[in-house]
Amino acid sequence: MTTGNQIKYLQHKEIDKAKWDACITNAPNGLIYGYSFYLDCMARHWDALVLGDYEAVMPLTWNKKYGFYYLYQPAFAASLGVFGKNLTKEIIEDFANSFPSKFKLVEISLNSGNIINGSKSFSLLRSNYILHLNRPYEEISKTYRDNHKRNIKKAFDLGCKVSKEVSVDEIIQLNKEQLQHIDGTKPEDYPNFKKLYEFLKNSGKAKTYAIVDPKNKVLASAIFFFSHNRAYYIMVGNHPDGKTIGASHALIDAFIKDHADQNLILDFEGSDIRNLAFFYNGFGATEEIYPALKINKLPWYIRLLKK
């Protein structure tokens, strides 16, 4: 059993990134978002809590506003939290109790390996949807909802086709136009994401997909990242013209067809939004629960400003 005093708070410059990344790679609950290169790209600042000799780690992604330090969830990083082998309830709670006191506000999402039943601190639960692709395509597609099957057929009957040559810039632009005002992504997050994409693309861990019409206009597009036998549906760029003809349905179906019968999980990255959950579930995806942590120790007058 560990104790909180075995968990060290390290500033960014003190982190041994080779040991850090080895921990993320070998953790049963490891996720791509936890790697140092991912955090370096997407977090405004990040420090860390480290157990022993990097037996378990937790990134502390932080920023500062009105003179107060706070922990926040970076863009395009759905789940962080504690990563490591042999995690117990006590270890996870020790990490949560080891935040430096300077962080007056905590609003972060942990990962599915951090669930603690009966804990008040970890009582806020969120939904992700995942689809195991370790079956033949014919078997997976049989589980599609009938409405999804009709939408997929409609898109291809209208002459749409799959493209894997769509540029990251076009996907980012579509994402900006359709989603930036909804999900709170900041303008500076996009060049950081592009840098991350290029890094992963060069190591064979990023792919782009699109559904285009007969004139090669992009109707639906997405970027997928790969790690830990997962394919992350990381960024979506859809055109309004594709919504009524099933372009997004056709895109996911094309990805599943290409990656079926592999030891791979398609990670949809959410969602608590009913319509998105319905969309993901329609492909046979199942719910994966993960906890979120909210702690507010801000002075009352700052809480008013935050509202």
Locate the predicted segments by residue.
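Non-catalytic accessory segments adjacent to catalytic cores
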Residues: 89-125
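Conserved acyl-donor/pantetheine-binding loop and adjacent beta-alpha core of acyl/acetyltransferases
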Residues: 64-79
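A conserved beta-strand-loop-helix scaffold within acyl/acetyltransferase catalytic domains
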Residues: 2-53, 58-67, 110-243
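Short, high-confidence coil segments that cap the C-terminus of an alpha-helix
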Residues: 44-46, 101-103, 206, 261-263
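Aromatic (often tryptophan-rich) hydrophobic motifs at membrane interfaces
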Residues: 93-94, 198-199, 205-303
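The substrate-binding groove and active-site-proximal loops of carbohydrate-active enzymes
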Residues: 78-86
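Short, hydrophobic beta-strand segments that form beta-sheet elements in well-ordered domains
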Residues: 49-50, 104-110, 266-268
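Active-site/acyl-donor-binding loops of N-acyltransferases
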Residues: 2, 62-68, 113, 119-139, ...
